[in-house]
Amino acid sequence: RQMCIRDSVYVVPEQEKPDPDFTTLEYPNPEDPKAFTYALRLAKEVNADIILATDPDADRLGVYSKDTKSGEYKSFTGNMSGMLIAEYLLSQRKEKGLLHENGAFVKTIVSTNLADLIAKEYNLKLIEVLTGFKYIGEQIKFFEQNNTYEYEFGFEESYGCLVGTHARDKDAIVATMALCEAAAYYKTKNMTLWDAMIAMYERYGYCKDGVK
């Protein structure tokens, strides 16, 4: 908490301490806009750049970011936040010469095809797996056992991704760190995360999320 205060990270007072009954909201789901009611109110008071919230077991991450043009806070889908993290991490690794020649980008079959374009941009093998993050975890294990590919990034549309190979499930804590790092990076360019997302669409093409 002291680190948060020092670094100008604001915690919603009403939701700061553990509350097994979740008395401040109907359903602690970061995919539900109602879960951000208190956070959005605080964000407007302190003029926050981004709003981040995880679910109770911290594997899914919900995101809002300010739109520079309108000043409004815009919500991200799981596809959007996943792609924003991927683009930032992969671009930084490429710039520093840290991308593997046999790198792999793993996604579930119901996730955005924008991932295909990003994988192509960074010369990564795009691998699609069945719905469920456990299948992404299985790919990591397969890579390690068979020395086929190096895992670069994996995500699913339901607000989950994994940066690194320390786990075999989605990890919202590390995703939060990655998005905060990305937010700081883009702020040096006078951009918010929402601005960066629009720039991604303009680069790769606009995508519409939908389930059939």
Regions from the PLM with identified roles:
Residues 10-62:
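N-terminal small/polar loop signature for handling phosphorylated ligands or for N-terminal nucleophile
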Residues 1-5:
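Short, small-residue-biased leader/transition segments that mark boundaries at the very start
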Residues 44, 48-50, 54, 71-74, ...:
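Phosphate-binding and adjacent anionic-ligand microenvironments
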Residues 6-9, 123-125:
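Structural alpha-beta junctions
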Residues 20, 77-89:
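Catalytic or ion-translocation cores adjacent to nucleophile or general acid/base/metal-coordination motifs
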Residues 23-28, 67, 141-145:
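Short low-complexity, flexible loop/linker segments enriched in glycine and/or proline
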Residues 59-79, 115:
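Short Gly/Thr/Asp-enriched flexible loops that form oxyanion-binding sites at enzyme active sites
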Residues 35-39, 85, 135:
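Well-ordered alpha-helical segments embedded in enzymatic catalytic cores
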